[in-house]
Structures are given as C-alpha cells and as structure tokens.
Regions:
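Hydrophobic/aromatic beta-strand elements that line small-molecule binding cavities or substrate pockets
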Residues: 54-61, 93, 116-121, 143-150, ...
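Short beta-strand segments that buttress and anchor functional surface loops
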Residues: 70-73, 106-107, 129-136, 145, ...
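Acidic, glycine-rich flexible loop segments
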Residues: 111-152
Length: 180
C-alpha cells in the first residue's frame, strides 16, 4: 500500500511540474526564420468588404543583441468583388533588449504625441507580441498588436487594431516556416 502511495505521489509530482516547464518563455532565437501563410481580416471600417483574405510573409532574424522583423501583407480589398484590388504593405522593425527579460524597445521608436510611431515587443512563453502606437493631431490614438504564437504546426498570427478604444480590425492566420 505504501509503495502505491509513493508511486502515485511521484506521478502527481511529475504531472504537476510538467505545466511549469511547458510554460517557460522561449528564446527570441526560436522565432528566427522565414514564415509564410494566410488569414482573414474582420474589418469594422469597411462597408462592403467586412471580411478580406490576406497573405503574409514574415522574416525574423538577429540584429545585434536584438532582432529585426520584416513583414509583408498582401490585401485583397475593394474594387469589384469578383476582382478585388490587391495591395501590398511592407514593414520593418528592429528591436533591442531592455533591462527587463523578454521586453524589447524599438530602435527608432518615437514620441507618439509628436507624430512619431512608438513600438515595443514582449516575449511571453511561446508568443512574441509587437505593439505599435500612433497619436493623430487631434489626440486620437491607434494601437496595433501583433501576436505571433509558435505551436507544433507553425505560427499563429493574431492582429488587433484599436482606434480611441474602438475595435477597427482583427486578423487571424496561420504561417509555416518556409526558410531560415
């Protein structure tokens, strides 16, 4: 009976310890590589095209002590529903570590009240979050959040855009690693 109790206690201790190790924050290097995929955007600011299809290309690579992230979004929106207009948006951000583990500051991040974009990133467990904040001349802010979460099958993207507290757009998608 004592042997069974000890065995059960041992198994319980292993099971209880597993989630803690599974929830450790990954290193930024785990995200390095080229990623490709697609998703769907839900837009509050569009009358005719509330949902649009998007393609994504993301490259995350080392840059000094930090990292650089380049991404391209292909947006199919507007025009004739059978032949929508296609636009490409490209962005590049370079981030360096702060004194806080898992927190990075943008190398050319500015003062949003002076018309400059402010951005930073946070690494928490298996999610790399990038935040961008802008303030217009009337003091109305826009906050964008890109969550890139690694899973066994690749990367999950969740994007949210708020303007003065109101949801403007949400994008969800999946990406797979397409290169180093």
């Amino acid at each position: 009976m004592m042997r069974i109790a000890l065995t059960l206690a041992f198994l319980f201790a292993i099971a209880a310890g597993a989630p803690a190790s599974a929830q450790q924050t990954l290193s930024i290097g785990t995200f390095f590589g080229a990623w490709s995929g697609g998703g769907v955007a839900e837009n509050e600011d569009s009358i005719y095209f509330r949902s649009t299809v998007r393609d994504f290309d993301v490259t995350i690579r080392p840059a000094g002590a930090g990292f650089r992230i380049d991404w391209t979004t292909v947006i199919r929106k507007g025009g004739n529903p059978d032949k929508p207009d296609i636009r490409r948006r490209k962005s590049t951000k370079t981030l360096m570590p702060t004194g806080t583990p898992g927190v990075f500051h943008g190398t050319d991040s500015g003062d949003p009240l002076s018309g400059k974009e402010m951005y930073w990133a946070r690494l928490d467990r298996n999610t790399l979050s990038l935040f961008l904040m802008m303030v217009d001349k009337d003091g109305i802010y826009t906050l964008q959040q890109y969550d890139r979460t690694l899973s066994g099958t690749g990367m999950r993207l969740s994007f949210k855009s708020l303007s003065d507290g109101d949801r403007q757009r949400e994008v969800t998608g999946r990406l797979i690693k397409s290169g180093k």
